[in-house]
Regions:
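Short coil/turn segments at the loop-to-beta-strand junctions that recur within blades
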Residues: 104-110, 149-158, 243-249
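Short loop/turn segments that connect beta-strands within beta-propeller blades
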Residues: 92-95, 137-140, 188, 231-234, ...
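Acidic, glycine/polar-enriched metal-coordinating patches/loops
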Residues: 93-131
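Acidic glycine-/aspartate-rich tracts in secreted/extracellular proteins
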Residues: 131, 176-177, 233
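N-terminal beta-propeller domains
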Residues: 1-98, 153-227
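Beta-propeller fold detector
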Residues: 99-104, 143-149, 194-197, 237-243, ...
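Beta-sheet-dominated scaffold domains
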Residues: 8-16, 118, 169, 206-278
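Asp-box/WD-like beta-propeller blade repeats and closely related beta-sheet repeat scaffolds
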Residues: 137-163
Length: 278
């Protein structure tokens, strides 16, 4: 056990920076009422932003209308990847133009994505909630993922909203025709769903709103429940309920923070550990 006999607590006040809860007559020297071009300093307080430059000088191209939203931004293979309208584009950092690497993604929604390496080659998989999930290699050659063929799982992964790699399988969820179902590929092959080779499906009793791998488990967030999948393959995959009383209303809020998972529940931000004790 550590010797704490020479350790004494020290109390100090966190002062300075932006103060909005005091009258200007009560503010001390060094406290600010309004800050422009400042950001939090990693050493405490605030620091002035000395300047900035655009990562890519050109805007992501529109495909049909200027009102189209940018639906995804990520980095892969030393490039910036962005989705807007019906297309996916790439650009070099510091570049001034975008290159189309995939098109025809009709009615695409907000994307989820996963970087992975199952066969010694880095890949990026994206899912938009409407079209087939698409895999890119480092040359940005696109391959659509499909399931439901002979000898494969019957549930098609086209229209998946969520995609994540777990225990060498690729997991898909959020299909409009199977909102309560989780589909996983065979080991080390994101586009193979042969049931006799290790692919399969898992059903829960609520609509899935997000997936997150945390430590050795895959957490399945639903509207009113949270489940946990453990194991490594079809032979020992096991699903247990974390809670059947509270769910996640927005899968984009699921984040790892301070050794736990946080998410937005119906009553605000919650931790999985705290929710499991309810």
């Amino acid at each position: 056990m550590a010797d704490l006999s020479q350790v004494t607590p020290v109390a100090f006040n966190c002062e300075g920076g932006l103060v909005l809860n005091r009258s200007t007559f009560m503010m001390k020297p060094g406290e600010a009422l309004e800050l422009q071009n400042f950001e939090p300093d990693i050493e405490g307080g605030y620091r002035r932003i000395n300047g900035f430059s655009k990562y890519v000088s050109a805007v992501v191209p529109q495909t049909s209308a200027s009102t189209e939203k940018v639906l995804m931004v990520c980095t892969f293979a030393s490039k910036v990847v962005a989705a807007r309208g019906t297309n996916i584009f790439t650009a070099d950092a510091g570049g001034s133009s975008w290159t189309t690497v995939d098109s025809g993604r009709t009615s695409a929604g907000k994307y989820s994505f996963e970087r992975f390496n199952f066969d010694g080659n880095d890949k990026l998989i994206v899912a938009d909630g409407t079209n087939a999930p698409t895999v890119f290699n480092t040359s940005f050659s696109a391959t659509d993922v499909s399931s439901g063929g002979g000898g494969e799982v019957s549930t098609a992964v086209t229209g998946a909203k969520f995609v994540t790699a777990f225990k060498e399988h690729m997991f898909y969820a959020g299909m409009s025709s199977a909102k309560q179902e989780l589909v996983f590929s065979v080991p080390f092959d994101e586009d193979n769903f042969a049931t006799n080779s290790g692919a399969g499906t898992i059903k829960v009793d609520d609509e899935i709103t997000g997936l997150k791998v945390f430590r050795e488990d895959l957490f399945i967030f639903c509207q009113n429940r949270i489940f946990k999948l453990s194991g490594t393959s079809t032979s020992n995959f096991a699903i247990t309920a974390v809670t059947r009383d509270i769910g996640c209303i927005n899968g984009d809020t699921i984040q790892e923070f301070a050794g736990d998972l946080i998410f937005l529940g119906p009553d605000g931000l919650r931790t999985v550990a705290g929710t499991a004790r309810i």
